[in-house]
């Protein structure tokens, strides 16, 4: 996996745990517009990864995490751009999790979830 797709979560650990574990070349965050436009918040995430010794590209894509159709459309665009991706469904809204699970089932894109003690590939 070169590209990790994260469903942005208000809980910071959910936004970094998978990337810190798998160390992909890039992480794409599907996030609300206030995060996609917040350069300071993006900078803090990038600084965290650099501090952890990761030279990883981060991409922030605006989407409504409460509308399944919008999440699915954004995931389609991500897969077109980064066909080597896998999707982490450990964070995000219930609607985004549903959309990502449905999308992965329909497209055969790898999907996983995790906790601090366990990683499950679905």
Feature-to-residue mapping (PLM):
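Periplasmic-binding protein-like
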Residues: 86-90
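Long, low-complexity, Lys/Arg-enriched
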Residues: 1-85, 98-122
